[in-house]
Protein backbone atom coordinates (compact mmCIF):
# COMPACT_ATOMS: atom_id res chain seq x y z
CA UNK A 1 0.00 0.00 0.00
CA UNK A 2 1.49 3.27 -1.14
CA UNK A 3 -1.01 5.65 0.43
CA UNK A 4 -1.60 7.02 -3.07
CA UNK A 5 -4.41 6.54 -5.54
CA UNK A 6 -4.13 5.62 -9.23
CA UNK A 7 -3.57 9.29 -10.12
CA UNK A 8 -0.68 9.61 -7.64
CA UNK A 9 -2.64 11.71 -5.16
CA UNK A 10 -2.65 11.06 -1.42
CA UNK A 11 -5.60 8.97 -0.24
CA UNK A 12 -8.11 10.81 1.96
CA UNK A 13 -9.15 9.21 5.28
CA UNK A 14 -12.83 9.67 6.08
CA UNK A 15 -14.82 8.40 9.07
CA UNK A 16 -18.22 7.08 8.15
CA UNK A 17 -20.74 9.55 9.54
CA UNK A 18 -23.75 8.76 7.36
CA UNK A 19 -24.75 7.17 4.06
CA UNK A 20 -22.54 7.35 0.99
CA UNK A 21 -19.44 5.29 1.85
CA UNK A 22 -19.55 2.24 -0.47
CA UNK A 23 -16.42 0.05 -0.30
CA UNK A 24 -15.30 -0.94 -3.80
CA UNK A 25 -13.53 -4.07 -2.48
CA UNK A 26 -16.12 -5.88 -0.32
CA UNK A 27 -19.05 -4.03 -2.01
CA UNK A 28 -20.67 -3.24 1.34
CA UNK A 29 -21.45 0.13 2.86
CA UNK A 30 -19.12 1.43 5.54
CA UNK A 31 -20.50 1.29 9.07
CA UNK A 32 -20.67 4.40 11.29
CA UNK A 33 -17.26 5.06 12.83
CA UNK A 34 -15.31 2.95 10.31
CA UNK A 35 -12.47 4.67 8.49
CA UNK A 36 -12.66 4.66 4.70
CA UNK A 37 -10.04 5.69 2.17
CA UNK A 38 -11.13 7.90 -0.73
CA UNK A 39 -9.14 8.12 -3.94
CA UNK A 40 -9.25 8.04 -7.72
CA UNK A 41 -9.42 4.66 -9.46
CA UNK A 42 -8.42 4.15 -13.09
CA UNK A 43 -11.14 1.91 -14.47
CA UNK A 44 -9.72 -0.94 -16.57
CA UNK A 45 -12.79 -0.80 -18.85
CA UNK A 46 -14.00 0.89 -20.92
CA UNK A 47 -10.88 2.11 -22.67
CA UNK A 48 -10.96 4.67 -25.45
CA UNK A 49 -13.45 7.49 -25.68
CA UNK A 50 -15.54 6.36 -22.67
CA UNK A 51 -12.60 5.89 -20.28
CA UNK A 52 -12.67 7.94 -17.12
CA UNK A 53 -11.19 7.69 -13.63
CA UNK A 54 -13.67 7.33 -10.79
CA UNK A 55 -13.62 8.33 -7.14
CA UNK A 56 -13.99 5.25 -4.93
CA UNK A 57 -14.03 4.38 -1.24
CA UNK A 58 -12.19 1.43 0.33
CA UNK A 59 -12.20 0.23 3.92
CA UNK A 60 -8.97 1.26 5.62
CA UNK A 61 -8.86 -2.14 7.34
CA UNK A 62 -8.87 -5.44 5.49
CA UNK A 63 -12.23 -6.64 4.21
CA UNK A 64 -13.12 -9.73 2.17
CA UNK A 65 -13.36 -9.23 -1.58
CA UNK A 66 -16.89 -9.63 -2.98
CA UNK A 67 -16.75 -12.56 -5.39
CA UNK A 68 -20.30 -13.86 -5.54
CA UNK A 69 -21.58 -14.90 -8.95
CA UNK A 70 -25.17 -14.25 -10.02
CA UNK A 71 -25.66 -11.80 -7.16
CA UNK A 72 -26.21 -8.07 -7.06
CA UNK A 73 -23.70 -6.25 -4.87
CA UNK A 74 -25.07 -4.91 -1.57
CA UNK A 75 -23.82 -1.37 -2.38
CA UNK A 76 -25.92 -1.39 -5.55
CA UNK A 77 -29.07 -2.59 -3.77
CA UNK A 78 -28.61 -0.01 -1.00
CA UNK A 79 -28.09 2.91 -3.38
CA UNK A 80 -31.00 5.26 -3.97
CA UNK A 81 -30.19 5.87 -7.63
CA UNK A 82 -27.71 4.12 -9.91
CA UNK A 83 -26.62 4.44 -13.52
CA UNK A 84 -26.26 1.19 -15.47
CA UNK A 85 -23.92 1.45 -18.48
CA UNK A 86 -23.48 -1.46 -20.89
CA UNK A 87 -20.54 -1.77 -23.30
CA UNK A 88 -19.81 -3.93 -26.33
CA UNK A 89 -16.63 -5.82 -27.34
CA UNK A 90 -15.18 -2.62 -28.85
CA UNK A 91 -15.82 -0.92 -25.46
CA UNK A 92 -18.42 1.37 -26.98
CA UNK A 93 -21.41 2.34 -24.84
CA UNK A 94 -24.69 0.67 -25.78
CA UNK A 95 -26.98 3.62 -25.15
CA UNK A 96 -30.17 1.65 -25.71
CA UNK A 97 -29.27 -0.61 -22.76
CA UNK A 98 -28.33 2.19 -20.38
CA UNK A 99 -30.69 3.04 -17.55
CA UNK A 100 -31.03 4.92 -14.30
CA UNK A 101 -32.98 3.30 -11.48
CA UNK A 102 -33.13 2.75 -7.77
CA UNK A 103 -30.56 0.17 -6.74
CA UNK A 104 -33.25 -2.18 -5.45
CA UNK A 105 -34.85 -2.18 -8.94
CA UNK A 106 -31.71 -2.90 -10.98
CA UNK A 107 -32.19 -6.69 -11.47
CA UNK A 108 -34.36 -6.55 -14.62
CA UNK A 109 -32.12 -3.86 -16.15
CA UNK A 110 -29.05 -6.03 -15.58
CA UNK A 111 -30.85 -9.12 -16.88
CA UNK A 112 -31.78 -7.30 -20.09
CA UNK A 113 -28.23 -6.02 -20.61
CA UNK A 114 -26.65 -9.40 -19.87
CA UNK A 115 -29.08 -11.16 -22.22
CA UNK A 116 -28.17 -8.85 -25.10
CA UNK A 117 -25.53 -10.54 -27.29
CA UNK A 118 -23.80 -7.19 -27.88
CA UNK A 119 -23.01 -6.68 -24.18
CA UNK A 120 -19.53 -7.56 -22.99
CA UNK A 121 -19.61 -5.85 -19.59
CA UNK A 122 -21.69 -3.43 -17.53
CA UNK A 123 -20.49 -0.73 -15.15
CA UNK A 124 -22.78 0.46 -12.38
CA UNK A 125 -22.18 3.94 -10.98
CA UNK A 126 -23.84 6.15 -8.43
CA UNK A 127 -26.08 8.31 -10.59
CA UNK A 128 -25.51 11.58 -8.76
CA UNK A 129 -21.75 11.75 -7.98
CA UNK A 130 -20.84 9.20 -10.67
CA UNK A 131 -18.64 6.95 -8.53
CA UNK A 132 -18.09 3.43 -9.82
CA UNK A 133 -19.89 0.92 -7.61
CA UNK A 134 -19.09 -2.29 -9.47
CA UNK A 135 -18.47 -3.88 -12.84
CA UNK A 136 -20.51 -6.82 -14.09
CA UNK A 137 -19.03 -9.21 -16.64
CA UNK A 138 -20.53 -12.07 -18.58
CA UNK A 139 -19.02 -15.42 -17.59
Feature-to-residue mapping (PLM):
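Short, hydrophobic/π-rich interface segment
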Residues: 84-121, 125, 138
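N-terminal, charged amphipathic alpha-helical interaction modules
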Residues: 1-75, 82
Amino acid sequence: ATGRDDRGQALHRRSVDGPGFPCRHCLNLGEPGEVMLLGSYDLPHPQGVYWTPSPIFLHENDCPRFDAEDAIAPIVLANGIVSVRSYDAAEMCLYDLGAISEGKDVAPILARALADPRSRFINIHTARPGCLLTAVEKL
